[in-house]
Amino acid sequence: MASQGTKRSYEQMETGGERQNATEIRASVGRMVGGIGRFYIQMCTELKLSDYEGRLIQNSITIERMVLSAFDERRNKYLEEHPSAGKDPKKTGGPIYRRRDGKWMRELILYDKEEIRRIWRQANNGENAAAGLTHLMIWHSNLNDATYQRTRALVRTGMDPRMCSLMQGSTLPRRSGAAGAAVKGVGTMVMELIRMIKRGINDRNFWRGENGRRTRIAYERMCNILKGKFQTAAQRAMMDQVRESRNPGNAEIEDLIFLARSALILRGSVAHKSCLPACVYGLAVASGYDFEREGYSLVGIDPFRLLQNSQVFSLIRSNENPAHKSQLVWMACHSAAFEDLRVSSFIRGTRVVPRGQLSTRGVQIASNENMETMDSSTLELRSRYWAIRTRSGGNTNQQRASAGQISVQPTFSVQRNLPFERATIMAAFTGNTEGRTSDMRTEIIKMMENARPEDVSFQGRGVFELSDEKATNPIVPSFDMSNEGSYFFGDNAEEYDN
């Protein structure tokens, strides 16, 4: 639990390690991504992919999904106990795209899960390397965050679609461990808890018996994770109430929705990590780079540097704009779906536009799409500057509330104001301050009312030149204060459906 003074850095969570010093952390994260790279190279050999085909992001995603599926114990067990027609529980596969006579062809491949597990372990010194698997899950989650909107999921749990900036990591599988929990947004945790409470309301036996005891432990653990994301005493006290409730019901759902809304201004701490597609690590390993020896960090210059030197391709549909496809993948690589566009644009060095203006659909290609008209192009994933990823949420001076635009969860530790429409947010807080959490609610509302949109977050923090790897000369950008930048305004993205 974060509040117990046992904060581990994300890299420690990511690599499952106990407390380590910076060098050890860099080495173990390096070992993790190096293992991913070695696995990818081996898979390309197995599949006889050309260099170009191996750099295709769609092929990378298929290979990543195969290894995640091969290690999904729970689902594998379920598939074996509930055999469904046409699904071999022991096999996994997906589309692989090959270049034939100037055209792209789709080939569906199937592999034994056991074989995939063997190749993965071999690439990871014989270990299961759960950290590497989680890393791939977070990359897929970041890609989903940048690609899809979760309006429907929000509405289903009684939340407001404008709270989309709280939904980081909403598509992460349950099994993503501590590293996964660290990158989940406040809204994601609230949604998981509400779903659980609703099941308890509809199913009398949900909290009962031996199973119910396990359910209860999971419920309290999720409450503690969410509590650890809040930075004000009143929000945390409300989480204690929700956690200790004998029989969670509608009152708890109300409290959770209230807390989620409050997080639009009193932002939670949510970790951000640059998780790259497996093919990027593969390219680096193939060129002789030794990640473990050199060390690697997910939150510093390393991912930027890796992307400066990697050429990755993507399939492009006939009506898509390659520059927009590049923006989508760039945002996913840096976990920047919920970042202020002013900040992202400055770092990237080219204008980053809101999703409603993108002429591109998702990266993955459905099995019924026509390959005849598919083209491919280079993804432009380079940046002008680099900046340190944050896990703080950007609230100004410690406990005081800071302004939060209705759609930002900062990714980069870079000075800016967080403009917001206080009226829009506060409108959601009329009325209900009675009940057992009334004093906490009143206190939270007071803090929110005192928040000023002109307050500066991340005071004095700047971006760095790519030659400045020790982060010695911060360049503090000046932004047009009035011009807020949410990626989700005027949104028309498709919904995420499993």
Curated annotation (Swiss-Prot):
Post-translational modification: Late in virus-infected cells, may be cleaved from a 56-kDa protein to a 53-kDa protein by a cellular caspase. This cleavage might be a marker for the onset of apoptosis in infected cells or have a specific function in virus host interaction.
GO molecular function, one term: RNA binding
Keywords: Capsid protein, Helical capsid protein, Host nucleus, Host-virus interaction, Ribonucleoprotein, RNA-binding, Viral nucleoprotein, Viral penetration into host nucleus, Virion, Virus entry into host cell
Region Disordered, annotated ranges: 1-21
GO term, biological process aspect, one: viral penetration into host nucleus
Record keyword Transmembrane present: no
UniProt record similarity statement: Belongs to the influenza viruses nucleoprotein family.
Role according to the record: Encapsidates the negative strand viral RNA, protecting it from nucleases. The encapsidated genomic RNA is termed the ribonucleoprotein (RNP) and serves as template for transcription and replication. The RNP needs to be localized in the host nucleus to start an infectious cycle, but is too large to diffuse through the nuclear pore complex. NP comprises at least 2 nuclear localization signals that are responsible for the active RNP import into the nucleus through cellular importin alpha/beta pathway.
Protein name as it appears in the record: Nucleoprotein
Organism: Influenza A virus (strain A/Turkey/Ontario/7732/1966 H5N9)
